[in-house]
Amino acid sequence: MTKIMEMSSSELIQSIQSGKLKICVIGIGRIGLPTALSFANSGLPTVGVDINSELVTSINSGMFPLKDEPGYGTIFENMIKEKKFTATTKIEEAVPQCDVILLSLPTPMDQNNVPNYSALKSVGKQLHDLLTSGSLVIVESTIEPGFVENELISIIEGDRSRLHAGNNFGIGVCPETANPGQILNDFERLPRLVGAIDDKIANIITKIYKHVFTVDLIPMPDCKTANAVKLTTNVFRDINIAFVNELAMLFEKLGIDIMKVLEAAKTKYNFQVHYPGAGVGGPCLPVNSYQMLNLAKSANSNLLKIVEVSRRVNESMPEHVVSLLKEGFEESGKKLEKIGRAHV
């Protein structure tokens, strides 16, 4: 393997273009697997690591698990056939053999809506023992601003007797920006943010991602700013959806069609339209809003009350939609049976 942190710019480019750079993606789920396939498809040998042994066995048997992701089925078949991508549960074998370690791990909420970074912290502890000097770590997971600088680096470094960030290993972020069901399309059109602990590492990450993706790469001054941008874009949507949801409920009482209002309003050039509904389009936005609220709390701030209120509004919408359906069914003499709920 190469020592990516010690390469000159020309040596790095040659290593990338010749396919000598080895990639390890830790966490090959909904986003991690397409990410790994994109790197492999660019000519960089890639290994995916996951604790789900059934998933790993299925992948290595040639079975693509993400049937609802257009375009990646064919890429998967080709990468498996050409042996450019493999999967394993053995992180201890994969990490020491790779130059770049991508972290695409889940960051869910606990029962109190507090971000749970246990997966990232656990992998960080393993990297402390497994990471080879000269390697590069890139966090793609959506995390709170400051997590890399304040927690993850110290976990990987330990007592600094072997590893020292910015000295003999690099670390940065490139938050994923893709929606399930259209990941390949999003990877090909949505700009990516690049942040790192110093400019040299940011430039290395940019060169690697330019080889894999054709989108614009936007340089950020550091990791926390890049992560702040990712959260801000999603929390912005959550807040605006809450606003139109409350408008919709008000207009119901006044006999005004919210859709006609929005269609006319969006003819104004600076109006960014959002639509009411039972949810906000999946699990990511709620998680990101709670991450932002946790960030404010950790800063001993009472700010962002608007985010907290917006979450309450949007979380109440499924019941409101059910009540509207119930009214409609009762008026028509029919019954409505509520069986369960899922994120929408």
Please report, for each region that a protein language model flagged, where it lies by residue.
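Structural/interface elements that position substrates and couple domains in central-metabolism enzymes
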Residues: 2-341
